[in-house]
Curated annotation (Swiss-Prot):
Enzyme class: ligase
Compartments reported by the entry: Cytoplasm
Family: Belongs to the argininosuccinate synthase family. Type 1 subfamily.
Signal peptide, first to last residue: none
GO CC list: cytoplasm
Positions that bind L-citrulline: Y93, S98, N129, R133, S185, S194, E270, Y282
Native source species: Psychrobacter sp. (strain PRwf-1)
Pathway: Amino-acid biosynthesis; L-arginine biosynthesis; L-arginine from L-ornithine and carbamoyl phosphate: step 2/3
SUPFAM superfamilies: Adenine nucleotide alpha hydrolases-like, Argininosuccinate synthetase, C-terminal domain
Residues involved in ATP binding: A15, Y16, S17, G18, G19, L20, D21, T22, S23, A42, G123
Residues that bind L-aspartate: T125, N129, D130
Name assigned to this protein: Argininosuccinate synthase
Subunit composition and interactions: Homotetramer.
Length: 411
């Protein structure tokens, strides 16, 4: 909504991190809209304490403060369903930021309804994808709740102007800590941590090694490989090395192990939904292992044509999530197909972690479609008649022979 349209805005629910940007937004909303601000802080595995956000909100006179641990819901209802699809955007990006936004949008509008709030607000800039993801999610779930995006309204355009605003309005910010803060714009959750800005704005400049926070460089990783056994039930990992774990615990464990072995680093230039190209670096240790292992499990248990159909639909599914349409009929339709495909994706995958690489080295399943009697290079005892291949080839080559008989050059 535009800044001119401020009538009847009495309560606003703000997605609040406790950092510089959202602390300034909280004060700006109070002053600009003369409205009560309610804060919502989500723990989705970013690895930082979220409780300090409470003290900062209280210092600004916020009366209703929501701080919630959403790690279990995030992993169970968002990340794991997405990984059943083997979703990758533009061939590389594992959608770590994209998949976190729908849950936050969902809780924002739910809290708004609990408090009879008129609007929600977020700290996403007007250049990025997150504004789209937050707002499309809110529209899908609560079209009557308005969204306020301060970065599209105010005239604060730099970190210096934000710091000046904070000082002028006595906003509780640790200015010394902010000056020492990483030069990169970072975002983290259970699935990944992302880095943008500073030297990364030059797509030819290599990221400095001290930027990476979750993983060692592959060169510094252990010289001895580590093997893991991942147990699957209907497309989801349920245990690691025999230890039963909840989805969020699986991700914590795999992030730790993958990071130790330098797995999951990515440096890409991607096409944002809003139209521009952006360079980002990502660490996704757990996701990298999960994707490789899941494909290994599917290779044993999925029918060929079902697997190929999934592969054809995967880019569309990934694009839907990247662009912010998690709450959409097309995503629901594809999810139903994907979930059906996982009915027999059950068993164990053995992977090897070594110096930035994850390799599937074994797989087994009670629903395996691998028939050793048929596939063997030894005597198959009549399980497969090789003479049948002649008719198969003749029929599949029929159209080619007709083309050739008409004098068409197929070379």
């Amino acid at each position: 909504m535009s800044i001119e349209n401020k009538d009847n805005i009495n309560k606003i629910v703000l997605a609040y991190s406790g950092g510089l940007d959202t602390s300034i937004i909280a004060k700006w909303l109070q002053d600009t809209y003369d409205a009560e601000v309610i804060t919502f802080t989500a723990d989705i595995g970013q690895g930082e304490e979220v409780e300090p956000a409470r003290a900062k909100a209280e210092a600004m006179g916020i009366k209703h403060i929501h701080i919630e641990d959403l790690r279990a819901e995030f992993a169970r209802d968002y990340v794991f369903p997405m990984f059943r699809a083997n979703a990758i955007y533009e061939g590389e990006y594992l959608l770590g930021t994209s998949i976190a936004r729908p849950l936050i949008a969902k809780r924002l509008v739910e809290i708004a309804k609990e408090h009879n709030a008129d609007a929600i607000s977020h700290g996403a800039t007007g250049k990025g994808n997150d504004q789209v993801r937050f707002e499309l999610g809110a529209i899908a779930l609560a079209p009557d709740v308005k969204t306020i995006a301060p970065w599209r309204e105010w005239d604060l355009s730099s970190r210096e102007s934000l710091m000046a605003y904070a000082k002028e309005h006595n906003i509780p910010i640790d200015f010394a800590a902010n000056k020492k803060k990483s030069p990169y714009s970072m975002d983290a959750n259970l699935l990944h941590i992302s880095y943008e800005g500073d030297i990364l704005e030059d797509p030819y400049a290599e990221a400095e090694d001290d930027m990476w926070r979750w993983s060692v460089s592959p060169e510094q990783a252990p010289d001895t490989p580590e093997y893991l056994e991942l147990e699957y039930e209907k497309g989801d990992i349920v245990a690691i090395n025999g230890e039963k774990l909840e989805p969020y615990e699986v991700m914590i464990k795999l992030n730790e192990l993958g990071g130790k072995h330098g797995i999951g680093r990515l440096d890409i230039v991607e096409n944002r939904y809003v139209g521009m190209k952006s360079r980002g670096c990502y660490e996704t240790p757990a996701g990298t292992i999960m994707l490789k292992a899941h494909r290994g499990m599917e290779s044993l248990t999925l029918d060929r044509e079902a697997a190929h159909l999934k592969d054809e639909l995967m880019p569309r599914y990934a694009k839907i999530i990247y662009n912010g349409y998690w709450f959409s009929p097309e995503r629901q339709m594809l999810q139903a197909l994907i979930d059906k495909s996982q009915e027999y994706v059950t068993g164990t995958v053995r992977v090897k972690l070594y110096k930035g690489n994850v390799s599937v080295v074994g797989r087994k399943s009670p629903y395996s479609l691998f028939d050793e009697k048929i596939a063997t290079f030894e005597d198959d005892a009549g399980a497969y008649d090789q003479k049948d291949a002649e008719g198969f080839i003749r029929l599949n080559g029929l159209r080619l022979s007709i083309e050739a008989s008409r004098g068409r050059d197929l070379s």
